[in-house]
């Protein structure tokens, strides 16, 4: 794990971002940007040793956020239920470029994408490769999510070249842990009497990764 670094992490209030920030804050100065609009969200960040900073990634309003971060870890994402493609591109793709420009002096950046960028394979047990075809949304809860994350990857690749900023794009699949995750979402839906949304009416196998194991992968990815 990196140590004595100044790390900016987004998506801190999300299911994945919080445990990753907690892991990194053990030996680093970690700043977490979010709107912190929910009651107790700022205090929850401070409790794990993170410096909370209010920012709006979608508009690019960072306030007085420093620019001397050594590493950028970008987990924030917008997943809207409506087919608002303009907002999805602005929040997921354009926001990534603006954030990388703000952290242009960093040593490295980790941009979190998603497994839903892949075009569905006829074999539900297919193990996807990075070179597999992209496209065709597979996130039933958000019709704009997959296409906007493909756009995000394109923006991140362009900014990495333009800024000469070493960047890793990680296509993250299902995760779980005390902070929630896919199994918890399904259980919550069942308990509430709601339908569990699947990628297809056929088999939908997953291989969820625990949030602690995911956090341990951040250092190698950086």
Summary of predicted features, one role per range:
Residues 10, 33, 72-76, 109-115, ...:
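SDR active-site strand-loop-helix element
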Residues 43, 81-88, 120-125, 181:
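Conserved catalytic-core motifs of eukaryotic protein kinase domains, centered on the activation segment
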Residues 123-125, 154-206, 211-215, 219-220:
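NAD(P)-dependent short-chain dehydrogenase/reductase
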Residues 7-27:
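N-terminal Rossmann NAD(P)H-binding glycine-rich loop of SDR-like oxidoreductase domains
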Residues 87-98, 139, 143, 147-148, ...:
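Glycine-rich NAD(P)-binding loop of the Rossmann-fold in SDR/ketoreductase-type enzymes
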Residues 97-144:
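Conserved Rossmann-fold NAD(P)-dependent oxidoreductase catalytic core, especially the SDR/UDP-sugar
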Residues 33-39:
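N-terminal Rossmann-fold cofactor-binding loop
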Residues 39, 50-91:
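NAD(P)H-binding glycine-rich loop region in Rossmannoid oxidoreductase-like domains
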């Amino acid at each position: 794990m990196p140590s004595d670094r100044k790390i900016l992490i987004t998506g801190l209030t999300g299911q994945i971002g919080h445990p990753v920030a907690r892991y990194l804050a053990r030996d680093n100065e970690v700043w977490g940007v979010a709107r912190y609009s929910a009651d107790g969200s700022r205090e929850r960040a401070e409790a794990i040793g993170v410096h909370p900073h209010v920012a709006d990634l979608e508009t690019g309003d960072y306030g007085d956020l420093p620019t001397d971060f050594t590493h950028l870890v970008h987990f924030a994402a917008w997943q809207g239920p409506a087919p608002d493609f303009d907002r999805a591109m602005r929040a997921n793709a354009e926001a990534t470029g603006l954030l990388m420009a703000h952290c242009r002096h960093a040593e490295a950046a980790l941009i979190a994408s998603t497994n839903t960028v892949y075009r569905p394979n006829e074999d539900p047990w297919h193990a996807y490769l990075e070179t597999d075809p992209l496209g065709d949304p597979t996130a039933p809860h958000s019709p704009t999510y997959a296409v906007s994350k493909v756009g995000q990857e394109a923006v991140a690749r362009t900014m990495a070249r333009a800024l000469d900023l070493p960047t890793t794009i990680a296509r993250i699949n299902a995760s779980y842990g005390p902070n929630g995750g896919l199994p918890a979402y399904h259980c919550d839906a069942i308990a509430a009497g709601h339908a569990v949304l699947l990628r297809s009416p056929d088999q939908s196998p997953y291989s969820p990764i625990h949030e602690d194991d995911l956090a341990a992968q951040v250092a190698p990815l950086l």
